[in-house]
Amino acid sequence: MKVNVKKLRDTAILPEQGSAFAAGYDLFADVAEALEIEPHKTAMIPTGLAMEIPEGYFGGIFARSGLASKEGLRPANCVGVVDADYRGEVKVALHNDGEVVRTILPGQKVAQLVVVPFLSVEFDEVETLSDTVRGVGGFGSTGK
């Protein structure tokens, strides 16, 4: 599958796959200079890219495992969604969960993009739902 990508600035870096079987494509910070993220704060990190995700798909913006586990940096909304009809700049709302200031450098990998198919659904309002063994059991109801 091809995804059309427009560089909004010459300094932008196209998404890159870290290995042959990686589902995620690295997104890079397109910042002119180092950007600091204070503890427990969020910064919008530009990528310098706009995309044309094919109809029937969306781009999921996920944390990079190393940034999350070693630096305490993750997307503020846990998973960002780039819809197929969005044509603006892709940005990463990066949150610092740590207790120290973190620095984002120009060209640094800040998140990963996974292009995912989805189904369009129609919601029908009903009076009752079918019974199941689980029923209304919620959080933790299926055991550890």
Residue ranges: model-predicted function:
Residues 1-144:
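DUTPase catalytic domain/fold
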